[in-house]
């Protein structure tokens, strides 16, 4: 999971992921058109994203297509975000219930 966090720590790599989210299955050239980076920089960032399993490559003939792989992001969500979110939602639910009970007792 550390490799995923390291990959996500860079703004340029997050921009690449955002671009793939907008239009999945892009070639290197297509990605370069939408980003203010050299072809070499995009290639470097894509390799790091592939190593983190955030991007997968599919060859279509001579074209190398890059696809966003959401699985590592989902794993982060489940491990780090989801578990804290559940507690907050439960606390809000308990607060709402308590306020409603208090209102009913007074009214």
Regions found by a protein language model. Give the residues of each.
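Residues in the helix-turn-helix
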Residues: 12, 41, 48
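A cross-family signal for key residues in well-ordered alpha-helices
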Residues: 18, 50, 56, 96
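Beta-hairpin "wing" of winged helix-turn-helix
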Residues: 51-61, 67
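Base-recognition residues in the alpha-helical recognition helix of bacterial helix-turn-helix
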Residues: 18, 43-44
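Alpha-helical residues within the helix-turn-helix
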Residues: 33, 44, 50-51
């Amino acid at each position: 999971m550390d490799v995923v966090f390291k990959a996500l720590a860079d703004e340029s790599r997050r921009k690449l992921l955002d671009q793939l989210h907008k239009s999945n299955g892009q070639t290197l050239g297509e990605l370069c058109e939408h980003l203010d980076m050299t072809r070499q920089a995009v290639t470097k960032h894509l390799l790091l994203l592939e190593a983190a399993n955030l991007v997968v490559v599919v060859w279509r003939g001579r074209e190398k297509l890059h696809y966003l792989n959401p699985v590592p992001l989902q794993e982060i969500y489940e491990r780090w975000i989801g578990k804290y979110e559940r507690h907050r939602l439960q606390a809000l639910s308990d607060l709402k219930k308590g306020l409603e009970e208090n209102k009913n007792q007074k009214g």
